[in-house]
Swiss-Prot record:
Keywords: FAD, Flavoprotein, Magnesium, NAD, Oxidoreductase. Couples electron transfer from NADH to cytochrome P450(soy) in the presence of ferredoxin. Its cofactor is FAD; Mg(2+). This is Ferredoxin--NAD(+) reductase.
Amino acid sequence: TXIVIIGGGPGGYEAA
């Protein structure tokens, strides 16, 4: 839930 963005660049982590 929610939106969590860690790194935001190549090799980063994004969960919506």
